[in-house]
């Protein structure tokens, strides 16, 4: 998994946005993908969303939240949006850095390679903050190993779609978000592991602003091959996905 996975040799246009409604960001992705197919640049969107659940194509009915989940007394219910990405259901919201790479992939297409590069970029960001993470075989995303009586915990989720050799959707890194919202769903369809954040693991507040630049650099380097994909010890063979 060396060398660039992109079909273009031009730089990636990184756009660091603020809080963007999910449906607005989804349409932005589609517009950028159309532009990329027409010869436009590769783009990386980095942003946050107001609280929302997004359900991938493989989401089962029992994995969804109930008709209303307020999270806290008096809070507004959280919408559920059905999407065309892979994977199952997850939550997005304040304190979580979401990245949408709109990238033209080189031939032959290798979506697994692409996902591994996204994982590698986030593993590096976590390591640079002093947090060891890795992969779990059979499950996408970035994980904290089990230990000290605690199960494996997902710190970053990945769900993508590739159409016309162009990527949409992407990754979500939990920085300083409210993890309670995950309790209303079966996150990513996985019931035997937990969800965590940089702040929860490092014992200090790690905001989106602190990691956004590092994530942009790491993702661009991983896609271009400057950050090679490596094996990370501690992964186990998952019993289910």
Swiss-Prot record:
<dbReference type="GO" id="GO:0005737">
    <property type="term" value="C:cytoplasm"/>
</dbReference>
<dbReference type="Pfam" id="PF21948">
    <property type="entry name" value="LplA-B_cat"/>
</dbReference>
<feature type="site" description="Lowers pKa of active site Cys">
    <location>
        <position position="154"/>
    </location>
</feature>
<keyword id="KW-0012">Acyltransferase</keyword>
<feature type="binding site">
    <location>
        <begin position="157"/>
        <end position="159"/>
    </location>
    <ligand>
        <name>substrate</name>
    </ligand>
</feature>
<comment type="function">
    <text>Catalyzes the transfer of endogenously produced octanoic acid from octanoyl-acyl-carrier-protein onto the lipoyl domains of lipoate-dependent enzymes. Lipoyl-ACP can also act as a substrate although octanoyl-ACP is likely to be the physiological substrate.</text>
</comment>
<protein>
    <recommendedName>
        <fullName>Octanoyltransferase</fullName>
        <ecNumber>2.3.1.181</ecNumber>
    </recommendedName>
</protein>
<feature type="binding site">
    <location>
        <begin position="170"/>
        <end position="172"/>
    </location>
    <ligand>
        <name>substrate</name>
    </ligand>
</feature>
<keyword id="KW-0963">Cytoplasm</keyword>
<feature type="active site" description="Acyl-thioester intermediate">
    <location>
        <position position="188"/>
    </location>
</feature>
<feature type="domain" description="BPL/LPL catalytic">
    <location>
        <begin position="38"/>
        <end position="227"/>
    </location>
</feature>
<dbReference type="GO" id="GO:0033819">
    <property type="term" value="F:lipoyl(octanoyl) transferase activity"/>
</dbReference>
<dbReference type="GO" id="GO:0036211">
    <property type="term" value="P:protein modification process"/>
</dbReference>
<feature type="binding site">
    <location>
        <begin position="85"/>
        <end position="92"/>
    </location>
    <ligand>
        <name>substrate</name>
    </ligand>
</feature>
<comment type="pathway">
    <text>Protein modification; protein lipoylation via endogenous pathway; protein N(6)-(lipoyl)lysine from octanoyl-[acyl-carrier-protein]: step 1/2.</text>
</comment>
<dbReference type="InterPro" id="IPR000544">
    <property type="entry name" value="Octanoyltransferase"/>
</dbReference>
<dbReference type="InterPro" id="IPR045864">
    <property type="entry name" value="aa-tRNA-synth_II/BPL/LPL"/>
</dbReference>
<dbReference type="InterPro" id="IPR004143">
    <property type="entry name" value="BPL_LPL_catalytic"/>
</dbReference>
<dbReference type="InterPro" id="IPR020605">
    <property type="entry name" value="Octanoyltransferase_CS"/>
</dbReference>
<comment type="similarity">
    <text>Belongs to the LipB family.</text>
</comment>
<keyword id="KW-0808">Transferase</keyword>
């Amino acid at each position: 998994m060396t060398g660039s996975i992109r079909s273009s040799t031009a730089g990636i246009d990184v756009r660091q946005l603020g809080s963007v409604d999910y449906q607005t960001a989804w349409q932005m992705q589609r517009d950028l993908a159309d532009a990329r197919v027409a010869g436009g640049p590769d783009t990386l969107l980095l942003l946050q969303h107001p609280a929302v659940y997004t359900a991938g194509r493989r989401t089962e009915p029992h994995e969804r939240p109930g008709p209303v989940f307020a999270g806290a007394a008096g809070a507004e219910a959280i919408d559920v949006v059905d999407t065309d990405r892979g994977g199952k259901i997850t939550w997005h919201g304040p304190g979580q850095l979401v990245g949408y790479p709109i990238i033209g992939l080189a031939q032959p297409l290798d979506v697994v390679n692409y996902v591994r590069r996204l994982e590698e970029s986030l593993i590096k960001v976590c390591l640079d903050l002093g947090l060891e993470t890795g992969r779990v075989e059979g499950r996408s995303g970035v994980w904290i190993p089990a230990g000290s009586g605690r199960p494996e915990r997902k710190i970053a989720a990945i769900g993508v779609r590739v159409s016309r050799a162009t990527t949409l959707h992407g990754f979500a890194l939990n920085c300083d978000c409210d993890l309670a919202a995950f309790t209303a769903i079966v996150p990513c369809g996985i019931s035997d592991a937990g969800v965590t954040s940089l702040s929860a693991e490092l014992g200090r507040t790690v905001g989106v602003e602190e990691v956004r630049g590092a994530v942009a650099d790491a993702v661009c380097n991983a896609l271009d091959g400057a950050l090679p994909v490596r094996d990370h010890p501690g992964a186990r063979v998952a019993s289910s996905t």
